[in-house]
Amino acid sequence: MDVSKCLAEGDPQGVTSRGQHRTAHTDRFPVVHTYPMPPVLFWLLLYSCCLCQGHCHPYDRLREQNTEFAVKLYQKIVTTENRTDVVISPSSVARSLGLLQFGAQGSTFTQIEKTLGYNVFDKSVKIFMKSMHRELTNSSQDTSICLACALFVQAGTPISTQFTEYTVQWANSSLQLTNFTEHNRTAIQINQWVNRNTGGGTETMVAGGQFGSGFMQIALVSTMYFKSKWKTKFSFTDTQTLPFISTDGSVVKVPMMHQTADVAYGQFETPSHEKFTVVELPYLGNTVSMFVVRPTDRNTPLSSIESNLTSKSITTWANTMKKIKMDIFLPRFKLESYSDLRMALSALGISDLFDPRKADFKGISEQKNLYVSQAIHKAQIEVEEGGTRASGVTAMVLLKRSRMPVFKADRPFFFFLRQASSGSVLFIGRVTNPLH
């Protein structure tokens, strides 16, 4: 029996593990009505859970914790860095923190565990992460995914053999030795590593002046690059130059892609009754989809929708949206973001690892004063008609009017790429001006 598909995942008829039938919902808290469960069904469900041998609930919890971390990290980065256009890969950051957790002890370990919601030494966590990474990086000719993390550690630091073994086993991670006293050489080493792990698209990520001296240091670096083809391609000949209303109210002309397809679509509202729409656009293979979220009212700020985002709301959207044939308009855009995670992670409760007096990494080395001096994250995403770089020719086509429903992302929106099987948010970002 596949323990990752146990009872707690639910069934297509909408019956929950407690015999509940969902009859209504909001975007955050589904409303359920409870009916008596037939005795035979109760025992069958109980037997199924026993077969799972405790894996059902841990796996569901891990899915939710992964999503919750993604949401909170995104919200912190958007607010602490005051970003307009941004993209991050929460999955990449989480794996980097997981690698650090192997070597952390004391309150440093506790802070990472509390923020991630799990302990990497737990066997179920290791199995879940390994399975998720294997599926995620199973690239084909239509999909390219590069996920990697590295710890750059001061040369001469005696590294624990056990930690080195953890590094080799943990999600395309590596341990790199460097000399932080040679600032420029360290920057070149990190930049070269990043360039190799972002499809060759990043030449400069750090500068030599970012590194201090006086303590033994660790630089935590994580990257993720994603490029794939749509399940239903946008027709390049249908791409038009259309107006997009940016955050400040100004209008810019952007290349707006178009497709007519059967997509999952839903209309929701926040607890304060601000309405928004969500559309799901799958990539080839149906393992990853892009969810595009846009306020319904032009006067509703995107931040009011983002601030109410939770892991439960994302699960609700994915489970309750309905298939409908409609016209989709989505701007062509490419985002590339660099993030210094120190402020965002500290705001999430992970602060000791950045303090040379409090950081405890005795699991990495018995060397004192070992701390994280840099936490660097790079993410890139490119959204185009067919998933490959478009040529320089722009076709101007006036689309015929249609009576079908229309979803037009002609105002600021946020998006996230979600892996269907694990529910993990691979990327999350916002677009306020597609031309940036």
Q: Locations of the language-model features?
A:
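Short, solvent-exposed secondary-structure boundary motifs
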Residues: L7-A8, P12, T23, K76-T79, ...
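Non-catalytic, conformational "gating/processing" segments within enzyme and secreted inhibitor domains
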Residues: R83, D122-S304, T316-S402
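Structural recognition of the beta-strand scaffold that forms the well-ordered cores
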Residues: R95-G98, M290-V292, F416, F427
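Intrinsically disordered, low-complexity basic segments at termini and long loops, enriched
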Residues: M1-P36, M396, R403, T432-N433
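C-terminal soluble interaction/assembly domains
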Residues: E385-H436
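Hydrophobic/aromatic-rich, well-ordered segments within soluble, folded domains that form packed cores
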Residues: I88-Q105, G214-W230, S424
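Detector for small/aliphatic-rich hydrophobic stretches
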Residues: D2, C6, V32-N184, Q192, ...
